[in-house]
């Protein structure tokens, strides 16, 4: 796929990067979301997800979704995502981890 199909957001405090997220625009999938641990619970993740959802909505995407770790489930619920059934997800490394598919229907 072309890089133009992806949208990346970098959150900064001052000039210091504190988090980032990436969205596959055609599918509405949040591919990555990371916030530095020392900035967790300071609204950084919410700002990043809000921007990714805004971009998806502007592109005509109807559903934004992701595969969330069990630790991230509560965060995604807080920002308006609905959880699916817990399942295993195979990482590129081949390791399987427990996860929860999450989705947010855009109005």
Predicted regions and their residues:
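Acetyl-CoA-dependent GNAT
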Residues: 1-38, 49, 55, 106
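C-terminal "cap" of GNAT-fold acetyltransferases
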Residues: 67-71, 79, 89-107
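Conserved GNAT acetyl-CoA-binding A-motif
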Residues: 56-69
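Residues forming the Rossmann-fold NAD(P)(H) cofactor-binding site
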Residues: 42, 46, 50
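Conserved hydrophobic/aromatic "anchor" residues
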Residues: 9, 20, 75-76, 81
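Residue-level recognition of the GNAT/N-acetyltransferase active site
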Residues: 36, 40, 67-69
